Each structure stands twice: as structure tokens, then as C-alpha cells.
């Protein structure tokens, strides 16, 4: 081994090394500061824009399906190899409807046949693309269909034909609409289905799909009773258009109505919608494309058809003075009942069509509508509700397993997950997968073994806080019972009758928060999901607030009912009530917690609409079942909260906040609005709230089935125990661990 000579370092070298070391430390420090600054800035930006870190969607993550994985169906064809055709199909009266067909190239070339999915829309079957974006389309025709592209590719790949139709008086079709959802659409739908069955690629079986208000159009197809129509999938369809969309509780949903009318007015006239609520779609509409796509190069014909659309009535104008279901539209001469699909429920039930309806808890009143449709089809309606609807035909198949109902924590048409407890607020549920399963079951006999729909109960509903999917055969689920609480002094809600008293508030006619609510369906479609601050303490300033004591672990599933005795100093009022979860408990370790006040659900009502009888909780919203509200007189009003499934954790409290619906979403009830609202309780005015509930958390219907030890842990929560032991923050105790209380009185 040779010893190395020691290095000789002069002063200059030492100085350079010292400087380099100093510079390295400086750069490292600067880099560290930059990284920290960038991280803080990014986090701050994400916070203020609502952006959160994505999560991996596995079983039991957010709203992910009870299956826990994607349903793939059977993939036969490459979506790039799709035969696309657009053409006019003439109706019997000579009116041309624009029809697009998508079929796998292989099916066309080999003269094979497949079932068809029909999509009838008044929002445009396709849109133009501006140069240079027109260079990058999948098809020879230069257009895009962003609202349905995922569905088209999925179903064509899986062995279906897809047919999109601009309904009469819209898109590129000819004619005009007497009004939305007129009976003419039923006749047109029958003819389109008949045309489909005669195409060389059709095997004679048809399904239909409809999202949002297009779902009402899909139900009109069922009302045609064409024998080829086998199944329909609805997502966010307000079946009761009056109560679930435009007049919840008889209160005009002004914002949704105006947005819908503005959108349809522009698209009917080949105008790119001018009121798009978010920046990205607005830029895309202005610079990428967005006009309705024409069928052919006949410009004169296209302009003529667009001109015919100007005869379509404007829904906002037509409903300007409308208050009751049986009021007539301003110029059309029909009542609102003739817009509502409820008038055709009998024909839909006797058509034999199987229907899968998705309803979002935070999508206007759509969950209630979806439940109503399922209950009607299965003959399980409350007798008072059934009396207001067409009689169920004797030939209707009322087997609940013939239909499906899925209720989840979604905004309008399932666009977003609005569960306040969802990790990263990320949607993990793929509606297209469940729709695919449903259609595979009904349209392909040999796919039933893959779809496995027959192995499941027909109802699936998601329980917020518990974050589990559950199943049932009837609605409401059989394990629930009603629990009544009474309002009383000191803004308390008690289990027993209370002394008489009253609480008055000064009415604030201003929006509570500058955030999105459940009622603006068009904004939901552009990714603005309903958002409610978790700490709603400031509501006390303008709402009458009542609160329960600490409660044991409780599941609430269904429609909460508020029987309210009130008076106002002016005759016109729209009432609103919020149900809230109050949590000021110490957190458990790893608890998914929202400390403060969390929104559960809400109810609105114009109290001129009384119940159909004194002991009923059902309103008809007809003129004959109305009353005049006089100043300073006490009235009883029944407010039905929008359906929800929610778990109230151990020692949480329920709060009810009552006030006047603000004009941000709703129109005023009249010219003279109240300045003072009084809530009366106790004695002859027993204001109360009725909860469809279960003491503890019901585990037997959780899907997939939980392990026995987990079920035992949950079931133990309903059992009374002897001592009180408040869990300290940071302990290992499960947030749903057995509730320890001196006595479980509920």
C-alpha cells in the first residue's frame, strides 16, 4: 500500500472553498424557502378554490359503489371504430327530427343486430367545433358531444347502438313546442322507437336514458307504451316537476327556473348560452365551439328550422304569476299539471318498462321524486299521496324487483359528491357502471350472470356520516320507527309535551351565505356543487333556532316532518327550515369530524298550501286546498324535509332553524313581505318534529355485508349502559363505538 502525499492547500483555494460552501448553504436555504413558499401558496390556492387532494376510490371510500370496483360489462369493440350517421327522420305530420346513430363498424359491416339506447334531448344531440379544434374529432363530422361522449363510447363498445334525437322544436329538429313535455313528445317518441326497430342494426329491443329534465322526456317514451321499450335509466329526474324542481313546497324556485329558461331560449335560437356560470366552460363555449350541430349542409333548411323554434314559449314568462298546480300558464292555456309527467304515471306503470331511478340527497327535491316513482310503480304509496295520482292500472307489474332505486349524496344528475364528510369531496360512484349493469340485465339475457342484479335488493341508499351503502325492498326501510320531539321554552326541543310560549325574530330578507345551494340545478351541471358551511352559528341572527339535548347514536332515514305553529305580521311568507347536526364533542382518534354545525337537510313551504285534511301531512298544491294567510293570526303548517339518510353520532344534538326563504333562490310570496316571524309552541300550539329513526345504527342491511365483529360493535351502540365515560381526544376509541350513557331514553 502506497501512502498518498498530503494535499497542499493555499490561501486562495481555502477562500474559494469557503465561498462555495457558503453559496451552497445559501442556495439550499433559498431552495428550501422556495419549496415552503410554493407549498404554502399551493395549499392556500387549493383552500380558497375548494381543491383537495384526490383519493383512491376503493370499497367504502366516499360514495363508491357497494360492489367496490368498476363494472366493465363485456367489451367487444374499439370505440374508435364507430359508424356515425346523422339524418332527418320525418314524423307523420311531416316534421323532421334530427337523429344521430352510433353503431360499431363491425356490426354494420357484418349485418349483425344489437339493442339500442335512445337518448332524447332538448339540449342538443351534438355541438359544433371551431377551427382548429375541429381537426381533432373522432368522427368525420366536425362536432362534439361532451355531455354524452362517455356513455356513447361505453355502450357502443359493449355492444349497443346509441341513438340521440333532438326533440321537436329544439336543436336541429324542425317544429316548435306547445310547451315543454307536451303529449306530442309521446307520439314522436313512439315513431322514433318504431323507426329504430326497422333499422338493419337493431335487434328490436330499446332502452332509454335521461339525465335531469331529460329524464322526464325518457318517461314520456315509456308513456308511449311501445312494446320494444324494455328499460329506462333516470338520473336526477324531477318526476314531480312542480314540487321537486320549480315549486318546492309551493315556493317558486326562481334561480333554477330562470337559468333553465335562459339556457333553452338561447339554444333554441342557435345562440351560445350567454350565462354560463363558470370560467372554463364559458371559454370553451366562446372559443372552442358550442352551436347546435346541423344535420347536413342545407343552410337554408337549417335556418328555417331554427326560426320555427322562436315560437317556443319562455317558461319563466309562462310561470310568472303561477302559484298552484292547476293554475294556467300565462299564454299557452294549459295548467302546470299538463307539464308534469305525473299525469302519465298510469301508462308508465302499465307499459311493463323496468325503471332505474337515481336520486341525489342534495339535488333539489329529486330524491323525493325518485322515491315517489318507485312507490307508485310498486304500489307502496301512502294512501293520501296515492289519492292525488292516477289510479294504478290492474295490469301493472308491482314487483319491486322489476325496478331499482338508488339514493346517494349527489348534486343535480349525480355530477358531484356533496357529502360534507367525503374525503377530498371526491365522487367515487360511477353512474355509468350501474346504468350499464341495469341495461345488461334487461337487454342481454346472457349477461345477467355478470350483472348480478337479481342477487340484490332493488333499493340502495347511502347513509351520510356512516358512509355505508344499505339495501332494502321497500321505502322507507322496515327497521325505522317515528320519534316525536316537541319545541319548548329556552329554544329547547324535548321528548315530552312542553309549556306554551312563543319566540319571535326579525326577518332578514337577504341570502344567508354567498354559496351554492341544492336548488340551482343548472349551476350543479357546471361543477358548482351544493356547499353549506359546517359552522352555521351565525344563523341564530336571522332564524328562530331550537335545539335538542345531547342524543344517543341515532340513524335518521327518510323524510323528517315539522308541524309548525306560526304567525307573521304580513300576509305573504315563504317558510324555510334547516335540520342541522350540532357537534361540540372532543374528537376520537382518526374520526372524520366536522366540528360545529353541519347541514343535514331542509324544507320550504308557502303556507297558503294546507294539508288535504287536518290529520294528514300531504299537500296537493291545488287551489282548492289553499287558504289565505292573515297578519298576526296563528296557523299550523306541515313542512316535509327533503329525504336523507344520516347518522347522528353519540352526544350530538339536532338543531332546527326556522325562518323566511331568501330571494337568492326563491321568489317572494307576495308584494308585502313580513318583518316579524313568531314561532308558537306548547299547549294548544304543539309545534313538533317527527324523525323516522333507529336507535343506534342498523347494520343488517349494509352492503356488502360487514364482518360479524364489526356488526356487533355497531349494534352495541343502541344498548343502555351504566356509566358515563367521555372519550378523550386522541384515544383509540372508534367514532361509532358503543355509546356509554347512564340511560338510553330514546
Specify the residue positions occupied by each region the protein language model found.
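C-terminal, loop-rich substrate-recognition/catalytic regions characterized by aromatic stacking residues
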Residues: 420-722
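An N-terminal hydrophobic leader/cap segment in hydrolases
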Residues: 40-88
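Conserved alpha/beta-hydrolase "acid-adjacent" motif
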Residues: 364-371
Amino acid at each position: 500500500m502506497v501512502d498518498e502525499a498530503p494535499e497542499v492547500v493555499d490561501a486562495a483555494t481555502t477562500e474559494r472553498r469557503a465561498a462555495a460552501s457558503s453559496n451552497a448553504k445559501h442556495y439550499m436555504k433559498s431552495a428550501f424557502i422556495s419549496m415552503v413558499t410554493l407549498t404554502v401558496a399551493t395549499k392556500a390556492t387549493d383552500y380558497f378554490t375548494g381543491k383537495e387532494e384526490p383519493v383512491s376510490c376503493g370499497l367504502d371510500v366516499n360514495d363508491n359503489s357497494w360492489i367496490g370496483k368498476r363494472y366493465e360489462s363485456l367489451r367487444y369493440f374499439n370505440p374508435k371504430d364507430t359508424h356515425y350517421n346523422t339524418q332527418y327522420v320525418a314524423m307523420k305530420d311531416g316534421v323532421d327530427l334530427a337523429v344521430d346513430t352510433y353503431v360499431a363498424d363491425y356490426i354494420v359491416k357484418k349485418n349483425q343486430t344489437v339493442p339500442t339506447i335512445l337518448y332524447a334531448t332538448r339540449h342538443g344531440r351534438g355541438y359544433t367545433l371551431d377551427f382548429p379544434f375541429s381537426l381533432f374529432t373522432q368522427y368525420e363530422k366536425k362536432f362534439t358531444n361532451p355531455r354524452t361522449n362517455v356513455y356513447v363510447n361505453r355502450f357502443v363498445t359493449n355492444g349497443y347502438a346509441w341513438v340521440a334525437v333532438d326533440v321537436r322544436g329544439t336543436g336541429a329538429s324542425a317544429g316548435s313546442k306547445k310547451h315543454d313535455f307536451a303529449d306530442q313528445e309521446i307520439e314522436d317518441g313512439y315513431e322514433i322507437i318504431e323507426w329504430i326497430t326497422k333499422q338493419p342494426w337493431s335487434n328490436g329491443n330499446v332502452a332509454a336514458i335521461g339525465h335531469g329534465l331529460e329524464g322526464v322526456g325518457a318517461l314520456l317514451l315509456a308513456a308511449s307504451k311501445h312494446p320494444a321499450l324494455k328499460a329506462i335509466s333516470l338520473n336526477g329526474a324531477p318526476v314531480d316537476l312542480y314540487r321537486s324542481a320549480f315549486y318546492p313546497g309551493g315556493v317558486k324556485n326562481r334561480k333554477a327556473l330562470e337559468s333553465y329558461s335562459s339556457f333553452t331560449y338561447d339554444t333554441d335560437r342557435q345562440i351560445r348560452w350567454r350565462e354560463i356560470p363558470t370560467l372554463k366552460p364559458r371559454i370553451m363555449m366562446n372559443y372552442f365551439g358550442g352551436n347546435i350541430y346541423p344535420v347536413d349542409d342545407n343552410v337554408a333548411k337549417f335556418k328555417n328550422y331554427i326560426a320555427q323554434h322562436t315560437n317556443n314559449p319562455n317558461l319563466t314568462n309562462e310561470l310568472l304569476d303561477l302559484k298552484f298546480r292547476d293554475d294556467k300558464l300565462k299564454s299557452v292555456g294549459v295548467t302546470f299539471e299538463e307539464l308534469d309527467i305525473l299525469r302519465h304515471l298510469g301508462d308508465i306503470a302499465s307499459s311493463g318498462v323496468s325503471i332505474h331511478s337515481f336520486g341525489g340527497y342534495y339535488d333539489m327535491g329529486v330524491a323525493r321524486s325518485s322515491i315517489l316513482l318507485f312507490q307508485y310503480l310498486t304500489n307502496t304509496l301512502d294512501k293520501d299521496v296515492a289519492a292525488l295520482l292516477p289510479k294504478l292500472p290492474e295490469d301493472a307489474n308491482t314487483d319491486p324487483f322489476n325496478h331499482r332505486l338508488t339514493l346517494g349524496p349527489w348534486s343535480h344528475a349525480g355530477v358531484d359528491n356533496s357529502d360534507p364528510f367525503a374525503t377530498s369531496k371526491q365522487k367515487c360512484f360511477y353512474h355509468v357502471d350501474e346504468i350499464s349493469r341495469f341495461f345488461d340485465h334487461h337487454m342481454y339475457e346472457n349477461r345477467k350472470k355478470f350483472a348480478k342484479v337479481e342477487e340484490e335488493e332493488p333499493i340502495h341508499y347511502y347513509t351520510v356520516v356512516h358512509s355505508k351503502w344499505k339495501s332494502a325492498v321497500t321505502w322507507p326501510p322496515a327497521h325505522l320507527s317515528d320519534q316525536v320531539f316537541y319545541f319548548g321554552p329556552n329554544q329547547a326541543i324535548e321528548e315530552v309535551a312542553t309549556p306554551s310560549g312563543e319566540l319571535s325574530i326579525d326577518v332578514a330578507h337577504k341570502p344567508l351565505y354567498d354559496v351554492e345551494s341544492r336548488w340551482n340545478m343548472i349551476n350543479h351541471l357546471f361543477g358548482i356543487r351544493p356547499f353549506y358551511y359546517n359552522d352555521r352559528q351565525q344563523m341564530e341572527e336571522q332564524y328562530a333556532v331550537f335545539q335538542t339535548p345531547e342524543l344517543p347514536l341515532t340513524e335518521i332515514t327518510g323524510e323528517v316532518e315539522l308541524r309548525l305553529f306560526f304567525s307573521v305580521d304580513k300576509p305573504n311568507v315563504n317558510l324555510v327550515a334547516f335540520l342541522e347536526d350540532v357537534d361540540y364533542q372532543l374528537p376520537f382518534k382518526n374520526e372524520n369530524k366536522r366540528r360545529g354545525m353541519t347541514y343535514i337537510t331542509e324544507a320550504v313551504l308557502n303556507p297558503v298550501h294546507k294539508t288535504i285534511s287536518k290529520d294528514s301531512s300531504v299537500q296537493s298544491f291545488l287551489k282548492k286546498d289553499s287558504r289565505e294567510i292573515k297578519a298576526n293570526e296563528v296557523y299550523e303548517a306541515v313542512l316535509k324535509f327533503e329525504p336523507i339518510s344520516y347518522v347522528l353520532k353519540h352526544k350530538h344534538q339536532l338543531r332546527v332553524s326556522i325562518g323566511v326563504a331568501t330571494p337568492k333562490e326563491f321568489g317572494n310570496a307576495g308584494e308585502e313581505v313580513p318583518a316579524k316571524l313568531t314561532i308558537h309552541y306548547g299547549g294548544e300550539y304543539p309545534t313538533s318534529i317527527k324523525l323516522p329513526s333507529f336507535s343506534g345504527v342498523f347494520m343488517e342491511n349494509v352492503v356488502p355485508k360487514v364482518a360479524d365483529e364489526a356488526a356487533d360493535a355497531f349494534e352495541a351502540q343502541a344498548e343502555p349502559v351504566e356509566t358515563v365515560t367521555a372519550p378523550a381526544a386522541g384515544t383509540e376509541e372508534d367514532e361509532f363505538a358503543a355509546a356509554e350513557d347512564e340511560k338510553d331514553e330514546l
